[in-house]
Each structure stands twice: as C-alpha cells, then as structure tokens.
UniProtKB/Swiss-Prot annotation:
NCBIfam families, sorted: propeller_TolB
Highest taxon of source: Bacteria
Signal peptide, first to last residue: 1-22
Localization terms from the record: Periplasm
HAMAP family per record: TolB
Protein known as: Tol-Pal system protein TolB
Keyword Oxidoreductase: no
Assigned protein family: Belongs to the TolB family.
GO biological process, one term: protein import
Any one cellular-component term (Gene Ontology): periplasmic space
Principal place of residence: periplasm
Binding partners and assembly: The Tol-Pal system is composed of five core proteins: the inner membrane proteins TolA, TolQ and TolR, the periplasmic protein TolB and the outer membrane protein Pal. They form a network linking the inner and outer membranes and the peptidoglycan layer.
Gene: tolB
Record keyword Cell division present: yes
C-alpha cells in the first residue's frame, strides 16, 4: 500500500499488517529524548508515616515521572538526593542550591483510616527559600496514582502557569493474532499507560476513537456489522448506541465541544462528505459537497467551524468549513501532504501528519503570532494520527517501528519524546482525552 493512501485508511480499512500482542498488558513508557534546558526540580521520596500497611503506589516516583515526561522539567536522580526532608521546616535550601535545583517538592503519606491515605506535600522555590504550594489530599489505596497525577498537575501549573494534563486518559486500539484470527480491542488507560481498561473487543477492525468533552463516552468506528458503523459507548457502564450505519462509509466521528453534535464522514450519497449529526434528534446536516474525498473532521475549539482532510486540490490538505456549512477554505499550504488534523485548545496550533517523499512525520502549524510557522515534532518515517493533550503541551501520535505499531508522546516544542509500547504487540489509533474532574 502506498503511504499517500494512509489518510483514507480509516475509511477503507486498508490496514497495515499487525503483529501479535497480549491485550491485557498496559502501555509502558520509555523516554527516548530529553532536554538539557529543562527546569531542574528535586522530588524527594515521600515516606509512609503511619500504622498499618503502606500504599503500594510510590507517590513521589509517579510525580517525578510525570514532570520528567512533560519535557519542561528534569528531576534530580535518586542517587543525588543527599537529604530527605519530609516537610518545609526540614529543608536546607543551601544544599539544593549547591545541587543547582530550582525547585524542591517534599511530603509524606499518612494513614487516614478506613482504607484511605492522606498525602501532604509542599513545593518550594529554592533560590528564594519560599513556599509556593502546600496541599493535602486524601484517597483510598486504589486511587493513589490519581492523587499523584493531580499533585503533578498542581506543581506543573504553579510553576509554568499552564494547567497540567497528567491526570488525563488516552484511548487507543490494539490487535492480536494474524490473518483471519485477528482480534481488536479499544482500550483506555491513564496518560502514563497505567490502569488499562478494555472498552470493547471485536473480531473486526475498530478505528477512530474520539472522546466526548466530558470524558464519559467514546465514539468509534466498528466493522462488526460487516460495513463500517459508528457507535457511542459509555466508558463506565459499557452501554453503547449505534448512531450511524448508512450505506457506504461511516467514519471519523468527532464530538463537538458542547458534546451535543457529532461530525462524521459519510458516503451515503456516493462520495465521502462531511456531515454533522445532532445527537439528540439524530438529524444530519451536510457541510461539504465536492467531487474530492472529504474526511477526518475535527472541531475548532469554539464549535463554530470544522477542520477536515480533503484531496480536492489534488493532494490531501487541511480545509476549514463553518459548522453550518458553506464554502471551505484551505488551511495548510506547506508540503504536498497534510492530513489527520488535531487542533489545540486555543485554536492556535494544528498538528498534522505531513508527508514528503516516502517520509511522514508529525508537524505543527502555529498561528500564535499571526502568520503560520511550522515545526517538525517527530523523526518519521511512518508517523500519523496526532492528538493534542488538553493543555497542548504534548502531542500523542502513532508510528511504525520494526513492523509493529507504537505510540509516542512528544512535547509541543519537540524537546522530549517518550515511547509508549506494548511489550509484545501493536497499538494504534491514539486519542488523548479531556481534563478529568475530581468528585
């Protein structure tokens, strides 16, 4: 299969060969790139200071790993942590100045009773010797990783001014077996690959997962009925609804920012076009009508327009059309292949799969300063399906390595990349979920 057809693969099921894997395994992270210019921060081990059984989760390790993979921070290696304060009054700031640390995080874990734990932690500016943050959180043992991610989010936001996105989830598709024995699974996991959860299994391909804005549902494409169909599924209950099973292609679902509508690509009238479905009434509005192939819709953050991939100009490029329909405007002009757009929360950045020759990389168009500027985020050579983190600090994407599918997350400044892989298999179709809300 020629690579320029990959932008249509989700619709035509021209899938690359998939290798065997163990579906029950979670993703594991391997940091493959870093940045010497990242901000130094010491995350001190947080001991259990209570009676009874200590929690299995190493809170400080999770916090440190989160900060490291953001690309913005560089945690002090454990071997260089010469003192282990657990509260601010024990911090000798000169020690950490000598170690050239900008910030230090200290804390402790205590028994909160009835199977719960309390974590108290503080963040200090080392140069000033001042406390920047001091919080306490309580959770049951099975929620300690969630608490750790929330701590990392708070630290990240306090220092950078940008909301952290560690306490989020990702969706992806795995496959097992070969030939006619292939089995597929739509999975959801924490953003660091832990706590994988199977949403649906199928003997037929599963494609294009897309999160509802409240993070409670996934829209996806399934071929279990023979033809492509679009389902909505509740992640917590497993309840699902068939919303599109028209003749021909039913593909590339995308929730609107208010969660009330679904953009999708349909060929019910012959040619793949962009439609919007009202999820309450199931009424369809056709947005495009062109002899070219229009697919892969994704909403602008304000809900007023939709970006999509089209070859109407001869090669795949990104276009934009009003959510009510009308004429479409071309958005991308650099390169002769740009597809599968993901738009940042503020609408200023668009990540795409960009092709040049036989190499396909993840690139980003940034309009923050007005005129678009481009940067390359991945090395290639078969990279696709970019998906922004909700704070746009990182981009999740799919790649091929050694004949199998892997996922990478790269910081939006391309300073750090992390590989997320299954130990023995194939993983594709990534989608980064929205912010989560504590209950």
């Amino acid at each position: 299969m020629k690579k320029p057809l990959r932008w249509l693969a989700a619709l035509t099921v021209l899938l690359l060969p998939l290798s065997a894997l163990a579906q029950q395994q979670g993703l594991t992270i391997d940091i493959v790139g870093g940045s010497a210019s990242a901000t130094p921060i010491a995350v001190i081990p947080m001991p259990y200071q209570g009676s009874g059984t200590a929690p299995q989760t190493d809170v400080s390790a999770v916090v440190g790993a989160d900060l490291d993979r953001s690309g913005q921070f560089r945690t002090l290696p454990a071997a260089q942590i010469v003192e282990k304060p657990t509260r601010g009054t024990e911090v000798q700031f000169q020690t950490w100045r000598t170690l050239k640390q900008n910030y230090i995080v200290v804390g402790r874990v205590m028994n909160a009773g009835e199977g719960a734990y309390r974590v108290e932690y503080e963040l200090f500016d080392v140069a000033k010797g001042e406390r920047m943050l001091g919080l306490a959180m309580t959770a049951r043992a099975n929620a300690m990783r969630d608490v750790s991610h929330q701590m990392a989010d708070a630290i990240y936001e306090k220092i950078t001014g940008v909301r952290g996105a560690f306490w989020t989830r990702i969706a992806y598709v795995t496959a097992s077996g070969k030939g006619g024995a292939m089995r597929y699974a739509l999975m959801v996991a924490d953003s660091d690959g832990y706590n994988p959860q199977t949403i649906v299994r199928s003997a037929e391909p599963l494609l294009s997962p897309n999160w509802s804005p409240d993070g409670k549902k996934l829209a996806y494409v399934s071929f279990e009925r023979g033809n492509s169909s679009i389902y909505l599924q509740d992640i917590a209950t497993g309840a699902r609804e068939l919303v599109s099973s028209f003749r021909g292609i039913n593909g590339a679902p995308s929730f609107s920012p208010d969660g009330r509508r679904l953009a999708l690509a349909l060929s019910r009238s012959g040619n793949p076009e962009i439609y919007v479905m009202d999820l309450g009434s199931k009424q369809l509005t056709q947005l495009t009508n062109h002899f070219g192939i229009d697919t892969e819709p994704t909403w602008a953050p304000d809900g007023g327009s939709i970006y999509f991939t089209s070859d109407r100009g001869g090669r795949p490029q990104i276009y934009q059309v009003a959510a009510s329909g009308g004429s479409a405007n071309r958005v991308t002009f650099q390169g002769n292949y740009n597809a599968t757009a993901s738009v940042s929360f503020d609408g200023k950045k668009i990540a795409v799969a960009q092709g040049s020759g036989n190499t396909y990389r993840i690139a980003m168009m940034d309009r923050s300063l007005g005129s678009p500027s481009w940067s390359t985020l991945s090395p290639g050579s078969l990279d696709e399906s970019p998906s922004f983190a909700p704070n746009a600090s990182m981009v999740l994407y799919a790649a091929r390595e050694g004949g199998r599918g892997v996922l990478y997350a790269v910081s939006s400044d391309a300073r750090v990349r992390q590989r997320l892989v299954l130990a023995d298999g194939d993983v594709r179709e990534p989608a980064w979920g929205p912010y989560r809300t504590a209950h």
